[in-house]
């Protein structure tokens, strides 16, 4: 079935390596790694396919003050990436799936399997050798995570924290917090080895650890390609279209 894509009038040039597949991404290290991950998945099936990753700064990257609960279900982290797709500067947009609003600017053509849905609590490494304080200072911006933390640590002081993984780890290291919450998928993708962690119990975000891929043209071709290659796990992507 893959041979059909070599004859597809739109996809053939990508599959044959005649032109680059241009992927839009946020600028963070994690976002760029996710774009490379998408590219590698396709290259398993189309070895001659090659790509260019074009990054942009999103509103969510520039605004480090607004609580995430105030921008839930908006394009805070996705609209600027999808603008590159809609304007024809890129062919596909690569997103963390849980950043998607209900009605994204571009059309979702694939949602991948999660590499790990779990949340982890990352403690300051000093707690490898000393007991945890009774009133933990925990950094988290997610309403869902805050509710869980309040049950697990009733005496904890839970404070908003924003920024890239590296920024949040720096805040932890500088002792602004005793612990911070992270997605284990992000830690894995970045190849981080964190010495003092605890896996939090469910519930987890249903899209955590998944990538969402968006397009603005040739939607049927892209959806067929990702589905045939086994890259799409969640076939109910029409709910985001």
From Swiss-Prot:
Pathway: Porphyrin-containing compound metabolism; protoporphyrin-IX biosynthesis; coproporphyrinogen-III from 5-aminolevulinate: step 2/4. It comes from the Bacteria. InterPro entries: HemC, Porphobilin_deaminase_N. Its EC number is 2.5.1.61. GO terms for cellular component: cytoplasm. Pfam families: Porphobil_deam. Tetrapolymerization of the monopyrrole PBG into the hydroxymethylbilane pre-uroporphyrinogen in several discrete steps. This is Probable porphobilinogen deaminase. The lineage of its organism: Bacteria, Pseudomonadati, Chlamydiota, Chlamydiia, Chlamydiales.
């Amino acid at each position: 079935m893959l041979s059909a894509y070599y004859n597809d009038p739109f996809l053939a040039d990508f599959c044959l390596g005649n032109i680059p597949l241009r992927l839009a991404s946020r600028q963070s290290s994690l976002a760029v790694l996710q774009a490379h991950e998408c590219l590698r998945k396709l290259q398993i099936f189309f070895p001659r396919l090659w790509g260019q990753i074009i990054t942009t700064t999103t509103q969510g990257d520039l605004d480090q003050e607004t609580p995430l609960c105030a921008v839930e279900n908006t394009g805070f982290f996705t609209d600027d990436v999808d603008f590159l797709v809609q304007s024809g500067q890129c062919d596909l947009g690569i997103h963390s799936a849980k950043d998607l609003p209900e009605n994204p600017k571009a059309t979702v053509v694939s949602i991948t399997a999660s590499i790990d849905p779990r949340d982890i609590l990352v403690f300051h490494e000093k707690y490898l050798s000393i007991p945890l304080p009774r009133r933990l200072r925990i950094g988290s911006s997610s309403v869902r995570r805050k509710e869980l933390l309040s049950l697990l640590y009733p005496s904890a002081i839970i404070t908003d924290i924003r920024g890239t993984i590296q920024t949040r780890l720096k805040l932890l290291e500088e002792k602004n917090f005793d612990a911070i919450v992270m997605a284990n998928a992000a830690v894995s993708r970045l190849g981080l080895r964190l010495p003092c962690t605890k896996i939090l119990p469910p519930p987890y975000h249903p899209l955590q650890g998944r990538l969402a891929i968006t397009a603005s043209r040739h939607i049927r071709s892209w959806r067929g390609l990702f589905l045939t290659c086994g890259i799409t796990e969640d076939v109910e992507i029409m709910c985001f279209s």
